[in-house]
């Protein structure tokens, strides 16, 4: 069985300096947040596609997109979509608790890389530059009682084998402590974005497939996720073998579902454009 979800970007404002991200503050593209009417239109479009699992995304915390803005949209989305999760800025335990009470069932937060020197090089400025805070944030969400928690590294930033081992050990530690939570692992490869970032490490299909199978063998009960960053052919081959959760019909622009001509800049280029 493959569980399908859709990402919904509600803001692309960001003060951060992530070298690999199209939302970074030095990227020259239009910034936008969804109005109430636009958010309603996005939800209606996704519901018409049969989407029942939604992931709300933002950049780092800003005055335009602060905690109250995110919390409002979580609460509103949960009134229309059965499963609502977030992939956003780091928060406190109290803030994650508010999100849970407003209908959020899960949090996705990537460490990006476990190599601290590479992490600090890639996160040039902004709140996300704090390596230790990023590493500790999963426990804030888990302490708040989130039912689902997604982890991952951005493949290509650093030595992928070292990052995969560190991710595995981190996940093992969290699963022992928060055994009632359902965990997932994602395998995002770096995709082209507005800044033209080139990853230091090239990750081919063969290596990615081996990595997915390794996690499936070592953790047979874990949810493994593959997004539309990957090609249709690769996703087709991996569906049901190692992968049991996939994004579908994805848009990385703000307002991209209800408007095919959304002027806002996307976080990265998607590969699998099927609806």
Please place each PLM-identified region on the residue numbering.
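Auxiliary Fe-S-binding modules of radical SAM enzymes
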Residues: 176-275
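A general structural motif
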Residues: 130-135, 167-168, 203-208
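Catalytic cores of alpha/beta
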Residues: 92-101, 147, 157-172, 231-241
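Conserved mixed alpha/beta catalytic, RNA-binding, or beta-rich assembly cores of soluble enzyme
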Residues: 153, 163, 167, 172-176, ...
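Conserved, mostly hydrophobic/aromatic
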Residues: 18, 56, 109, 141, ...
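Core AdoMet radical
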Residues: 25-39, 46-141, 147-151, 155-157, ...
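Canonical Radical SAM [4Fe-4S] cluster-binding loop centered on the CxxxCxxC motif
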Residues: 5-38
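An N-cap/entry alpha-helix motif that binds or orients negatively charged groups
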Residues: 1-3
């Amino acid at each position: 069985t493959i569980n399908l979800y859709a990402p919904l970007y509600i803001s692309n404002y960001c003060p951060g300096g992530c070298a690999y991200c199209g939302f970074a503050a030095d990227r020259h593209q239009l910034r936008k947040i969804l109005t109430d009417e636009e958010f309603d239109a996005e939800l209606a479009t996704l519901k018409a596609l049969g989407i029942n699992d939604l992931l709300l995304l933002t950049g780092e915390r800003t005055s335009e997109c602060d905690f109250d803005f995110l919390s409002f949209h979580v609460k509103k989305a949960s009134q229309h979509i059965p499963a609502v999760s977030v992939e956003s800025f780091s928060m406190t335990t109290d803030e994650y608790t508010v999100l849970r009470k407003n209908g959020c069932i899960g949090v996705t937060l990537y460490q990006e890389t476990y190599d601290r020197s590479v992490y600090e090089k890639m996160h040039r400025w902004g709140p996300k530059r704090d390596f230790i805070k990023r590493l500790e944030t999963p426990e804030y969400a888990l302490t708040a009682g989130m039912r689902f928690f997604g982890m991952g590294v951005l493949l290509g930033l650093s030595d992928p084998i070292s990052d995969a081992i560190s991710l595995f050990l981190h996940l093992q530690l969290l699963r022992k402590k928060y055994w009632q939570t359902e965990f997932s692992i994602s395998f995002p490869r770096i995709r082209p974005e507005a800044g033209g970032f080139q990853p230091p490490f090239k990750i081919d299909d063969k290596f990615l497939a081996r990595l997915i199978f390794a996690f499936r063998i070592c953790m047979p009960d874990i949810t493994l996720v593959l997004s539309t960053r990957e090609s249709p052919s690769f996703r087709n081959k991996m569906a049901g073998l190692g992968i049991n959760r996939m994004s579908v019909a994805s848009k990385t622009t703000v307002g991209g579902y209800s408007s095919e001509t959304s002027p806002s800049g996307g976080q990265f280029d998607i590969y699998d454009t099927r609806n």
